[in-house]
């Protein structure tokens, strides 16, 4: 269960695990990998840091085989495509 005390590493692990449920070719933002009320429980600074972690993962050796960073939304949220 996600709450204000959930560590960044735990949040990142949730993202990586949830990617299994995303179909290849689907475009998404990190926020969509969490239920609405869970995302709202994560502090703004941790949401920003989590976004940076996912972006680094997508550009790294392991993540680049799974995710492709795309452009950003008008709200400046990074979009990704599942490979």
Name the predicted role of every residue range.
Residues 1-3, 36-40:
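Charged, low-complexity surface segments at secondary-structure and domain boundaries
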Residues 1-9, 18, 72-83:
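Phospho-regulated, low-complexity intrinsically disordered regions of nuclear gene-regulatory
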Residues 6-27, 40, 56-59:
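Positively charged, polyanion-binding regions of nucleic-acid-associated proteins
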Residues 8, 38-53, 66:
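Short, positively charged loop/turn segments that connect secondary-structure elements
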Residues 26-36:
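Short acidic, hydrophobic short linear motifs in intrinsically disordered regions
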Residues 32, 56-83:
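Charged low-complexity interaction tracts in eukaryotic proteins
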């Amino acid at each position: 269960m996600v709450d204000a005390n959930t560590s960044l590493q735990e949040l990142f692990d949730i993202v990586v695990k949830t990617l299994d449920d995303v179909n290849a070719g689907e475009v998404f933002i990190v926020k969509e990998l969490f239920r609405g009320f869970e995302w709202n429980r994560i502090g703004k600074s941790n949401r920003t840091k989590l976004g940076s972690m996912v972006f680094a993962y997508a550009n790294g050796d392991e993540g680049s085989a799974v995710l492709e960073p795309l452009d950003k939304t008008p709200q400046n949220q990074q979009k990704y495509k599942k490979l």
